[in-house]
Amino acid sequence: MAKKSMIARDVKRKKMVERFAAKRSALMEAFANAADPMERLEIHRKIQQLPRNSAPTRMRNRCWATGKPRGVYRDFGLCRNQLRERAHKGLLPGVVKSSW
């Protein structure tokens, strides 16, 4: 189980990313389309003034059951341990053991 503070930090980051997504994407698009170097510099400064945690890069995929940050399968949102455990119990529809 991950520390509660780390899970809370990621939840906070997720909310902040959602809050600033429109503004950040508009600035990034303007930055890509700007031809004048001074205009690009000004837009870059505006992007830098946004909160650091509003960047989607800073979010971390975590297991929704345990909060573990590593070995998380995107399709299920579960870490490898929980995925294996739940698949053996038959709690994941469509998941079967492979045999060849």
From Swiss-Prot:
Keywords tagged on the record: Ribonucleoprotein, Ribosomal protein, RNA-binding, rRNA-binding
Keyword Cell inner membrane tagged: no
One GO cellular component term: cytoplasm
One Pfam family this sequence matches: Ribosomal_S14
InterPro entries on file: Ribosomal_uS14, Ribosomal_uS14_bac/plastid, Ribosomal_uS14_CS
Listed GO MF terms: rRNA binding; structural constituent of ribosome
Family, similarity comment: Belongs to the universal ribosomal protein uS14 family.
Assembly: Part of the 30S ribosomal subunit. Contacts proteins S3 and S10.
Function: Binds 16S rRNA, required for the assembly of 30S particles and may also be responsible for determining the conformation of the 16S rRNA at the A site.
Name of the protein in its database record: Small ribosomal subunit protein uS14
Organism: Synechococcus sp. (strain RCC307)
